[in-house]
């Protein structure tokens, strides 16, 4: 006779199952388990008196015979494709299977074989997500990378050379010499990294040189002159060599207006950074381009979400980041032209309806590298409180909204930049770059971060203690962050053209160099999962009011946010 457990007892032992709901941190977002791949009564769990023991849940199968390297048991997977309960098998640094783990000699329906060579990570009661991707990085200081890793990011894409003034303001690694030095430096970090070259040129020669030097993308920035000629030249090179282009348009409208930029793009795929405009772009109506089918629009996190403090902090932030002086009236006017409460409020709603596709940081250059996930979920929470349930929801939960928002910093930036064949989602065959979360700390403080199947970071107590938990507990690099494990657990992304030109042999770096692919005509706004809406956007040039398909987009600023001070008392 089978043993019956209450739902509460079952969830406490094995984690939630179908129909159970989980609150995300202290938000008003609730997810519900849609499917359970495990078998009730045949669950595997590690520990004294538990299932994963020799001859029970652990088989005699060798690694060569099919046993996985690592199993994450009874995890609640949260990804763009679903919210499901499953065991996760990892092998050779990749996701080998999502299903039912155990001993096929003793248990039915086993799709993930646990053997003597299998390590166990207890996923009971934990949420597992794909590692986050930040697609707007100013590489101003290397310490950003550890900050990002400890927040749950496993891939960073952008440009820079350190605290040079070009890098402080723009997301570019200019020239093949600097790109080579950054690719060499990447060996030192437990993080997947990708570098963008400078895209501002009216002739292609120097841009081709950077792509052949390893640039995965080219960045057009107004501080270098984002003219129609530069836009056209940059996109022409990108189309020839299959790299993405990111654009920060002309705030001052010196070389043209938003219509001129759209005309210069000529329908070609482009990633529009901080499309709302506070981070830079045609004032006051750059936000209009989010309705273009070839434009992939993104946000940087200081405007996420719109709060009572957003406007005030942006003015000071902008003066520092763009080398402006508070004693020069023209500089003050430039700064004030970029900060508009009406477009920032509209940005909240455009994210909620899926018209803005990506959220990134703009690290140390009007953005916070460790708050990509936090700001994303704060925006989702604010929108639920102000706008209620989304019409796409099918149950008494927030599953669709949560899938929409997690896609903004996982799969969508990966698709936009040609990395989705390797990273961006928790799917079989992709790199095992995973983040485990205690639901109470979801999006704020990870429980564990894996890179290429190895544990790279985790909160850890006193190393001299008799157990791992005594205070002080803080985030520390783990074994995956050291030695050759570090260089074998993460990769550096480059262009295919650079690999064909022998870049790996010339630089002799330890990390694998992996080519980006399908960044041009094969993708566009329609490729952005759960975030592909293309409304017709209008901006009143005098009041800055924003309308989408004729509807006024406005909301109140938040006065209180979740995932904030109560999580950072210490």
From Swiss-Prot:
Pfam families: Amidohydro_1 (PF01979), Urease_alpha (PF00449). Keywords: Cytoplasm, Hydrolase, Metal-binding, Nickel. Binds 2 nickel ions per subunit. It is an enzyme of class 3 (hydrolase). It comes from the Bacteria. InterPro entries: Amidohydro-rel (IPR006680), Metal-dep_hydrolase_composite (IPR011059), Metal_Hydrolase (IPR032466), Urease_alpha_N_dom (IPR011612), Urease_alpha_subunit (IPR050112), Urease_AS (IPR017950), Urease_asu (IPR005848), Urease_asu_c (IPR017951). GO terms for biological process: urea catabolic process. Ni(2+) 2 binds at residues 219, 248, 274. Its cofactor is Ni cation. Ni(2+) 1 binds at residues 136, 138, 219, 362. Heterotrimer of UreA (gamma), UreB (beta) and UreC (alpha) subunits. Three heterotrimers associate to form the active enzyme. This is Urease subunit alpha. It comes from Rhizobium meliloti (strain 1021) (Ensifer meliloti). The gene is ureC.
């Amino acid at each position: 006779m089978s043993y019956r457990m209450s739902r509460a007892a079952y969830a406490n032992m094995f984690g939630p199952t179908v129909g159970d709901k989980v609150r995300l941190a202290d938000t008003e977002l609730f997810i519900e388990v849609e499917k359970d791949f495990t078998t009730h009564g045949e669950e595997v769990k590690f520990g004294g008196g538990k299932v994963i023991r020799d001859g029970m849940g652990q088989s005699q199968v060798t690694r060569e015979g099919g046993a996985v390297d690592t199993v994450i048991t009874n995890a609640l997977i949260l990804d763009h494709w679903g919210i499901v309960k499953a065991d996760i098998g990892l092998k050779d640094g990749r996701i080998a299977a999502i299903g039912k783990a155990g001993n096929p000699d003793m248990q039915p329906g086993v799709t993930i074989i646990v053997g003597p060579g299998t390590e166990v990570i207890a996923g009971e009661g934990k949420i597992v997500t794909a590692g986050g991707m930040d697609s707007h990085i100013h590489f101003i200081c290397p310490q950003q990378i550890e900050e990002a890793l400890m927040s749950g990011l496993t891939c960073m894409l952008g440009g820079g050379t350190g605290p040079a003034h070009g890098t402080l303001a723009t997301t570019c690694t200019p020239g093949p010499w600097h790109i080579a030095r950054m690719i060499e430096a990447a060996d030192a970090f437990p993080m997947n990294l990708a570098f963008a070259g400078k895209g501002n040129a009216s002739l292609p020669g120097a841009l081709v040189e950077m792509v052949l030097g390893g640039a995965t993308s080219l960045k057009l920035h107004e501080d270098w002159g984002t003219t129609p000629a530069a836009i056209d030249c940059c996109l022409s090179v990108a189309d020839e060599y299959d790299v993405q282009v990111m654009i920060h348009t002309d705030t001052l409208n010196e070389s043209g207006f938003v219509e001129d930029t759209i005309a210069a793009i000529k329908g070609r795929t482009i990633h529009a950074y901080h499309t709302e405009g506070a981070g830079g772009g045609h004032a006051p109506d750059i936000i209009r381009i989010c309705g273009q089918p070839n434009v992939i629009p993104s946000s940087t996190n200081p405007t996420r979400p719109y709060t009572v403090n957003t406007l005030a902090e942006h003015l000071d932030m902008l003066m520092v980041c763009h080398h402006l002086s508070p004693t020069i009236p023209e500089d003050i006017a430039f700064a004030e032209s970029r900060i508009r409460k009406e477009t920032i409020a509209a940005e909240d709603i455009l994210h909620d309806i899926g018209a803005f596709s990506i959220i990134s940081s703009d690290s140390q250059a009007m953005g916070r590298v460790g708050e990509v996930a936090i700001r994303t979920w704060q925006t989702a929470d604010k929108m639920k409180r102000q706008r209620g349930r989304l019409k796409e929801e099918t149950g008494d939960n927030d599953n669709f909204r949560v899938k929409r928002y997690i896609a903004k910093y996982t799969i969508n930036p990966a698709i936009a930049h040609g990395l989705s064949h390797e990273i961006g989602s928790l799917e079989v065959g992709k790199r095992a770059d995973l983040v485990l979360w205690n639901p109470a700390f979801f999006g704020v403080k990870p429980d564990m971060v894996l890179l290429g199947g190895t544990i790279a970071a985790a909160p850890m107590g006193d190393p001299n203690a008799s157990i791992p938990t005594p205070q002080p507990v803080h985030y520390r690099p783990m074994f995956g962050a050291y030695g050759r494990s570090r260089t074998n657990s993460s990769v550096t992304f480059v262009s295919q053209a650079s690999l064909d030109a022998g870049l790996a042999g010339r630089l002799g770096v330890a990390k694998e160099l992996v080519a980006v692919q399908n960044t041009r005509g094969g993708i566009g706004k329609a490729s952005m999962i759960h975030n592909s809406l293309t409304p017709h956007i209008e901006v009143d040039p005098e009041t800055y009011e924003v309308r989408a398909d004729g509807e006024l987009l406005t909301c109140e600023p938040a006065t209180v946010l979740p995932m904030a001070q109560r999580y950072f008392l210490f």
